[in-house]
Amino acid sequence: MRRFGFFSILFIFLVSCSSEGKFFRQSYPDKFKLSAETDVMETLSGNTFVANVKNIHPVFGEALTIKVRGLKVDSIETEDSSSASRAFRQWHKFSNLLKEASDIELRNLERGRNGFWIWADVYIDGEILGDLY
């Protein structure tokens, strides 16, 4: 009986440590589709928006702040009027792209630092957002 217990524990240990063993691993989706009408809530800046992400627990997926990887934008909160004007135009263009999109997809999600938000590659109608912008 002791021998059976020892080998059972040894088997569980080896399977859990093995890179081949997938008994305890869970897979997660690598793409998330959003609807511009129902999921996108608001646009915060020229590269940041808030959306409800489906297939994620509501604690993490509802009203999630998403920053688009690769888009550099000016800050609206600046004293330089030309920079603020440029930031407003970037926000307006980004907002319109999201509103007019028929298909929005998030890929390569990465948790942001210093806050509850994520970085993502955002695809609009099959094209990565950086190429459209």
Question: Which residues make up each language-model segment?
Answer:
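Sec-dependent N-terminal signal peptides
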Residues: 4-14
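Small beta-barrel nucleic-acid-binding modules, primarily SNase/OB-fold domains
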Residues: 17-133
